[in-house]
Regions:
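Proline-centric
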Residues: 7-12, 253-264, 275-323, 332-365, ...
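Short Ser/Thr-interspersed hydrophobic loop/turn segments at strand-loop and sheet-helix junctions
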Residues: 221-239, 249, 266-280, 527, ...
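Short coil/turn segments at secondary-structure boundaries
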Residues: 138-154, 170-172, 199-203, 279-286, ...
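Flexible, glycine/threonine-enriched loop-and-boundary segments that flank and lead into catalytic domains
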Residues: 1-4, 50-52, 156, 160-189, ...
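A generic secondary-structure signal for well-formed alpha-helical elements
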Residues: 11, 15, 24-25, 38-46, ...
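Signature of N6-adenine DNA methyltransferases within the class I
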Residues: 1-174, 199, 209, 214-218, ...
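Secondary-structure capping and boundary motifs in well-ordered enzyme cores
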Residues: 23-26, 30, 58, 222, ...
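Terminal accessory regions of large proteins
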Residues: 330, 337, 350-353, 361-366, ...
Length: 654
């Protein structure tokens, strides 16, 4: 910075000065003085904006710019070459694109002062520059940086970690909340680049807000109010999400507040092609600051445009919410989209559907095809709505020559159907039914803490002892594979059971019969999928003896009781050990009387069982040690803390 400011002192009058630096001085608020000194006292003749990956190694991640200026004040246009888009897979194109005149821009540096802070936006057209005559968005809405707790591990939880009866949902005023009963409040914390609705993942312990680094106590008037939130890491796009209220907000999930009608106009603008133009210019780093958004010019729509925008926004938010709630990480998740509701099932049983539908009802493939079409329709409708909104805002800002309304598939942030993912999530839902988290008889969460209500379960009764073994053979009647087969039969009917199991197995992939494929999935892949869905904060805990699969069992964290390990040891670990002893005895007899070729196969089985028996023997000692401690857990402490209490007997979180 010192050298940039002093550069004219090192040059003769009318002499030329050149630099190669990063581009931060051109845009960031902290460099305003640098820009003012340079733009007022020097005449820029050329700029080459290389973007990232000009150099090899770590320095290649930095956006590089080269420029030449003259120690004079001349009223002439500078020439700039913009190569920022030629990166990643297009890096090799930088050289040739330097000579492509479509990448050339010509600008008067005096025009940069049209924008507060004078960012060097050499590629802005006159129309974009003129738009800065409009007031900033900060005059239209209250845009607020979020709070910092100072210790997220202590004060934040994923909502799935807690007792759901202790979360204060849908509150509009903090005074409505008894923090001794419901200390946890939903919390915006950014997340993936998702538009319109979603990323409802965290809750904050508001009963401890007095310990936060910065609780934004001067902003109490916007606590829990409807807003728009976004992720501060935006890259080359911007994604606003509508919130109906009931949330606190993090510095990573800052918010804009206004009346509801204004919020709808604002989120339409945020998620249009207009906002990224300004965000990129006002702060080209990957982090979007509150101050940058406040400076974006706000051009008000006319009455007709206003009504059209609100209609489109309402529909698009609703569609996005429907998609978000179709996955189990949403607290408004009702049931898996491939599972018929209890009402549909009753109608089916009383023959209220057409004959053709009744024939298809028991086939998972039919439900998947319906879901696939629903996803496709939703995706296409959101894209159509976004293109209509783009048309409106492009017209409002007069940027028809700059932008097209077209939206690419990659920019639509709802998910399409995916057979493998959706079958794996169906299995996860089934496991939830086995534990009582979900029920086929009620929509939504049946149990996630609080009081157990047995009346919610009639079609499938949850596992009574909260321990479901995962075996590589039929050792237990309530083994997870057997339970899953029974679940599929109950949901879709016995007539289509084998067909449905094959459909599931084909989606999972693998060798063997459908039941073998499903069993192998539970043994090898289910828990990895679970950790991914729940972001390494599992609600089903895998008790695991090790690599030989001597013993595996799932436990639902919200139903954990202090005597669980003692029951697991006597009812499952000891039972498994006895089965190994019995099998090994039978194998020894069989080997003695087997032919040479059979003996090879049987000996291999014997070795596997011996290794499993040895592994479970060592595991039993660890379980015994912990069982004697009669450990209790508090869900408020979070998965990270509670899981560690049983680290010696649980699968590693990877």
């Amino acid at each position: 910075v010192m050298y940039i400011c002093a550069q004219r002192n090192f040059s003769k009058k009318n002499g030329f000065i050149s630099f190669i630096t990063t581009n931060s001085w051109m845009y960031l608020k902290s460099f305003v003085k640098v820009r003012e000194i340079s733009l007022k006292n020097l005449s820029f003749t050329s700029i080459v904006d290389y973007g990232t990956e000009l150099f090899e190694g770590k320095i290649g991640h930095l956006p590089i710019i080269a420029w030449v200026s003259q120690n004079a004040t001349l009223n002439r246009k500078l020439t700039a070459v913009r190569l920022v888009d030629f990166r990643y897979g297009r890096r090799a194109e930088k050289h040739d694109e330097y000579f492509n005149h479509s990448n050339y821009y010509y600008a008067r540096q005096a025009d940069f002062f049209e924008i507060d802070g004078a960012p060097v936006v050499y590629w802005f057209s006159s129309k974009v520059l003129e738009s800065f005559e409009y007031p900033g968005i900060g005059t239209f809405a209250e845009i607020v940086s979020g709070m910092t707790t100072g210790d997220n591990d202590k004060f934040l939880r994923q909502w799935t970690e807690t007792d759901i009866s202790r979360i204060a949902f849908d509150k509009t005023d903090v005074s409505q909340i008894d923090l001794s009963i419901t200390p946890w409040i939903p919390y915006h914390k950014g997340g993936e680049q998702r538009k319109w609705y979603g990323n409802h993942e965290y809750v904050v312990n508001w009963s401890a807000s007095g310990q936060f680094n910065r609780a934004k106590t001067t902003m109490t008037h916007v606590y829990l109010k409807p807003c728009i939130t976004w992720s501060d890491i935006s890259g080359n796009s911007f994604a606003g999400r509508y919130c109906f209220g009931g949330f606190m907000f993090d510095v990573k999930g800052s918010c804009a507040f206004a009346d509801i009608n204004k919020l709808k106009i604002l989120i339409g603008l945020f998620n249009s092609k207009i906002t990224p133009i300004y965000v990129e210019a006002l702060n080209p780093t990957s982090t979007t600051q509150v101050g940058d958004l406040k400076r974006i010019p706000y051009a008000a729509p006319n009455t007709e445009q206003n009504e059209k925008i609100k209609t489109l926004v309402d529909e698009t938010v609703s569609l996005s919410k429907g998609e978000w709630d179709s996955f189990e990480f949403s607290w408004d998740y009702n049931r898996h989209p491939l599972v018929p509701s209890s009402t549909e099932k009753k109608e089916q049983e009383t023959s209220q559907f057409s004959h053709s539908r009744m024939e298809k009802f028991g086939h998972i493939v039919w439900h998947y095809e319906k879901w696939q079409q629903e996803c496709e329709d939703r995706f296409n409708q959101i894209r159509t709505n976004e293109e209509e909104l783009n048309c409106i805002y492009i017209d409002i800002y007069g940027l028809q020559d700059e932008l097209t309304p077209d939206v690419e598939d990659k920019d639509v942030t709802v998910r399409k159907a995916d057979l493998e993912r959706d079958i794996r999530s169906l299995i996860s839902y089934a496991v939830g039914c086995m534990f009582g988290r979900y029920s086929l008889d009620v929509d939504g969460l049946a149990y996630a803490g609080g009081e157990w209500d047995a009346s919610k379960y009639s079609t499938i009764i949850p596992d009574k002892d909260n321990i479901i073994p995962i075996c590589d053979d039929d050792y237990f009647d309530d083994d997870i594979t057997g339970r899953f087969v029974k679940w599929v039969e109950t949901v879709y009917g016995s007539d289509t059971l084998e067909e449905n199991l094959k459909f599931i197995a084909d989606a999972l992939g693998g060798k063997g019969t459908p039941r073998e494929v499903i069993r192998n999935y539970f043994i090898n892949d289910f828990y990895a999928d679970h950790l991914k869905i729940y972001q390494k904060r599992p609600i089903y805990w895998l008790f695991d003896s090790g690599k030989k699969n001597g013993f595996k069992a799932l436990v639902y964290m919200h139903r954990y009781q202090s005597d669980l390990l003692a029951r697991m040891r006597t009812d499952y670990v000891h039972e498994q050990q006895e089965r190994y002893r019995t099998q090994l005895s039978h194998l020894a007899d069989a080997i003695d009387h087997a032919s040479a070729s059979e003996r090879v196969k049987l000996t291999k089985q014997q070795k596997k069982l011996q290794e499993q028996a040895l592994e479970i023997q060592k595991y039993e000692e660890k379980v015994h040690h912990l069982a004697d401690q009669n450990i209790s857990i508090d869900l408020d402490d979070g998965v990270k803390h509670n899981y560690e209490l049983f680290a010696d007997v649980l699968a590693k979180i990877k």
